[in-house]
Swiss-Prot record:
One of its GO terms (molecular function) is metal ion binding. This is CMP-5'-(N-acetyl-N-hydroxy-3-aminopropyl)phosphonate hydrolase. Pathway: Antibiotic biosynthesis. Nucleotide hydrolase involved in the biosynthesis of the phosphonate antibiotic FR-900098, a potent antimalarial agent that acts as an inhibitor of 1-deoxy-D-xylulose 5-phosphate reductoisomerase (DXR), the first enzyme in the nonmevalonate pathway for isoprenoid biosynthesis. Catalyzes the hydrolysis of CMP-5'-(N-acetyl-N-hydroxy-3-aminopropyl)phosphonate (CMP-5'-FR-900098) to produce CMP and the final compound FR-900098. It catalyses: CMP-5'-(N-acetyl-N-hydroxy-3-aminopropyl)phosphonate + H2O = 3-(N-acetyl-N-hydroxy)aminopropylphosphonate + CMP + H(+). InterPro entries: NUDIX_hydrolase-like_dom_sf, NUDIX_hydrolase_CS, NUDIX_hydrolase_dom. Its cofactor is Mg(2+). It comes from Streptomyces rubellomurinus (strain ATCC 31215). Residues 177-206 are annotated as: Disordered. Its EC number is 3.6.1.-. Belongs to the Nudix hydrolase family. A motif (Nudix box) lies at residues 74-95. The keyword Metal-binding applies.
Amino acid sequence: MRWLGRGERVVHDSRFLTVSVADVELPGGETVEHHFVRAPGAAIIVVQDERQRILMMYRHRFVSDLWGWELPGGLVDDREDPAVTAAREAEEETGYRPRNVRHLLTYQPMAGMVDSPHHIYLADGADLVGGPTECTEAQETRWMPLDEAAELLRSGRTVTSGTAIGLLAVLGLGGARQQPGGVQEQPGGAQQQGMNESHSGRTVRG
C-alpha cells in the first residue's frame, strides 16, 4: 500500500536541512499531515589494509552526547560524487588517502521521516599523505583489527548507523580485500606508507 503526496510546504530551510509538512493521502482515503526532513546525503568509507585492519576514529557526538568509534565519512557536497566525498573525508579526518575506492551499498537511515541517502564505500588500504586537516573531528585515529571492530558492534561502542552497516557489510564479505582488476584507483594513489603516526597531538595507532 502506497501513501500519496497531495502537496507540501516548507517550514524551515537551511543549507544543512529542510523541514517540510506534506498532505498525505493514506490507502484508506484519509488525508493527514506528515512532517519530514530532507538533508544532504552522506558518504562513509571502510578503509581496510592488507592485515584486515580497519581505519577507525574515536569521537564525540554533540547532539546525542555520546562517545564512540566511527568510520570516516561526512556530508556529500552539492553535485559531488559520493565516492569523492568518502575519499576526501577520510583524508581530511585522518591524513590517509584511500586506495581502490568502490561502492558497497546505499541505504536510508530513517526512511519514514528523513530523506538522506547514506553511501557506504570500501577501500583497499590507504596512503599517509599528511596530518588531518579537520582537527576538531576525532580524539583518536586507529587501525583496528577486524575482530576487534566486530566486538565494537556487539558491545554497543559504535553509535552511528553508517559505521554499524559498513562494518557489518565487510564482515558479511568475510573481510576479504578485492584483488586488482576492475577497480578504479583514486587519483594520487601510491605505495602505502607506515601505519604508526601521530597527528596534531592526536594518536594514530597501528
